[in-house]
């Protein structure tokens, strides 16, 4: 029995032994880490531990006991020093953040809707403070600046200053106190619904009006409003203050209106960040961003921010699957189910505004010329229904014929149809392997016919012919004519100079001059017909005005021998006076007017230097005599460099009557000016 016991015991002992001695250290084998088997290994060196081979059981066991050896004591002391150092750094960071936070908080009122339970209040304040610090570092300007240019900078920095805290941010009481009272808010919203929203109608006015009542009920009950709703309403208030500074509805003047606009845009920016509008977009945050991009930012001269905002809105719309609203799967889900048609129509309006804007911008000069981001075959969205907001019914059968009396959505639908033509022009240029300026003339005439067809088929109130029943006081009805006139001008402009020399292209010259003169007349009518709304602040009105004046100047300079020279000068001066009246409220008008003066002034100086005694006015001007860079027409595909530096702080305010239009300029110099100007401000 003893022999059998010893034999079995030996077999068990043999089976329990590993096939080879472990070569990893004790720490790596215990923690199941990959050991590089260099004693000390990298894991132990990083943790400042004693590295002991696993085969040395006795020394490894001593490491498991607290205070078992001097190496363990040294390791604990070093770890304590590291922890103390980290605590000191954290304390210094908290001190810096707390100083910044105390400057922003109002000591008289409640500081936040968030309590300090669980450290959440500190997390919110730290995130907000870091947000402000990062914005200041990014913009290199003090955050308390109240200039209107700060509006664009706020939204530029908002894309790099969003911090993801442990909980969702809230809007503190001092920020909420910047909002107008309920009575003032209702007045501002009524002005927005009457005067502003008609230009780009992608919201549902009754829904936003109900939203206003809900938000102010929450504020009166000391509750935190929904952030995306607050962002949209703050944007509405800001736009009403911006465009209604001359309105009799409001007591504030121009300077106070700018201050209020900046204040409420700042609230909207904070609400958008609190709503996490990039990661978690909603219909309301999309509407807020598009309103700011469409109405405000371009007029302040920040086209790069406009492109960023529109791109972010497009990404948000894709996240919400707005491009598949009417896909077969979604249509099947809506069958025999309760459908919120107001929500469906609002999403259609947002998507088609983004798509039409994308296609129109692709038709204009600039970095986006000839390319668009939204492909029509990659979306399944019906056009918005031609219906007034209050007529949207639960049954879904509320569409109105487009030829009948116009509704809230009529212009938006017509604008979308025009954008489809623009997209097809871009596709035609791509298929032909040429630039838009090089389209065959028969293709240009075909698209010209289609644009005129849209105007002819539009409701009578949108037409400008004498037989139409348009009311002169309803300036928004002129939106369609302005858009088509600028499109025809852009389409025929490459043939403007040739139209005076070759009868084949005389139609293009006639179209350019006729549309330019009609735009100037419409701008005069719009600025004088409605004192409640400052049209000079709409960049989509100032841009066609500048293009029209530039076409008249170009035609005069290239064809000075033609009769009625005094009349042609007079209409040019009239256009300049309109631009001069706009430049105080429009950076676009100021920039365009200064560029035009610089062009004429430089060319006149070159002509006088060439022959100061006899005043030679020969049209044959050497390329080097102009102050503008000359461009080879064969290499028109390369981007045009800047024409000249714009000195905004010192504009040329010489009297218009002293401007010299008898200058020697060629077609390429005007094309450079068109490209430079439209590259900064594409029309849509």
From Swiss-Prot:
Subcellular location: Nucleus
Species of provenance: Paecilomyces divaricatus
Example of a GO cellular component annotation carried by this entry: nucleus
Xref: InterPro entries: Sec_Metabolite_Reg (IPR050613), Transcription_factor_dom_fun (IPR007219), Zn2-C6_fun-type_DNA-bd_sf (IPR036864), Zn2Cys6_DnaBD (IPR001138)
CDD domains, sorted: fungal_TF_MHR (cd12148), GAL4 (cd00067)
DNA-binding residue intervals: 25-51
Keyword Zinc: yes
GO molecular-function term, one example from the UniProt record: DNA binding
PANTHER family per UniProt: CENTROMERE DNA-BINDING PROTEIN COMPLEX CBF3 SUBUNIT B (PTHR31001:SF90), UNCHARACTERIZED TRANSCRIPTIONAL REGULATORY PROTEIN (PTHR31001)
Keywords: Coiled coil, DNA-binding, Metal-binding, Nucleus, Transcription, Transcription regulation, Zinc
Location, primary (coarse class): nucleus
Region Disordered, residue ranges: 601-644
UniProt-listed SUPFAM superfamilies: Zn2/Cys6 DNA-binding domain
SMART domains: GAL4
Name this protein carries in UniProt: Agnestins biosynthesis cluster transcription factor AgnL11
